[in-house]
Amino acid sequence: KEPLEDKGWYRTMQSVARVMMMVRSVGISYRNQYSMSLPGFMPMIGDAFGQTRSVGAMSPGLDFAFGMIGDSYIDKARDNGWLLMNDSVATPATTNKTEDLQIRATLEPIKNLKIDLNANRTMTTAKSIQYMYEGNPTTQSGTFSMTTLSLGSAFEGSGNAGNGYHSATFEKFCKSLDGFRQRVEARYANAVYPEGTLLAGKKFDPANGGVNKYGSDVMIPAFLSAYTSMGGSSLDIFPSLARLLPNWSVRYSGLTRLPWFRDVFKSVNINHAYKSIYAVGSYSSYSTFMEYMNGLGFVSDATTGNPIPSSMYNVSTVSINESFSPLLGIDLTFENNLTAKLEY
């Protein structure tokens, strides 16, 4: 009787089953760290969870004791009369927040072929909040990074002096700026200039100062669209989790199953790894920013004083760091334990 392992349909089903079960492990790590410094807090600290009874409520509150607070706690403390509301208090409240997501997965679609996928997204935000003034004037700064794919330009030549070091991707980026500027400006179609500006109450008119073609609101989305696979038509400076893309490393160790390799080598490993990180080196908020809605707003033009459309973020640098480590590598161990390594 023919063994089951020799039947074609059985081998096919084995291969299909292996592909369906190729995910060997998945790991997800999420860290959300928040801290607050609140000068001018007046109530005394009690013995039970740090609480004391003040008028109408315990202070600083069980939400504070168990770390379940956010920036809105400053409004709560002010409304309860816990803060020293005096212009002589020059030290603002400060908050620091870090969000870090790490996703890892190991795949083995066929025997001896292992693929490690990893994706991460990290954002840090620091705020300085002048709670003693009306409107809680706030300044903000931070950093941002996430994994992406930028293979479209990875193998593009750098050109030469004869063609002015021409880059097709850079040309695509430059040509897209006008289109992105128009799309950003279209978001202000029904906007009204905010109070406290020279044009307060009037409908937005680009003739008074439109979106800057070379501002970060335009150039960063155009840059991501041209150089990465996550850009698309989005206008986000800080891409969301939905646009997170993985990097990877690949290792194949099955060549020693072949007779010639098995006779000469103890092990033969073929390696490949790819890494691409989009990063906002640092950003800060404009001191003259006035919000219109959903993060859109206006800043004062340094020359005319007119309000011009802008997000609140003044971004100094963005970058995409891409590397193959290696593009192709071979690790060899001979029968006499001599090792050799080739990488490109």
What does each of the following model-derived ranges do?
Residues K1-Y344:
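Exposed, low-structure sequence patches enriched in small/polar residues
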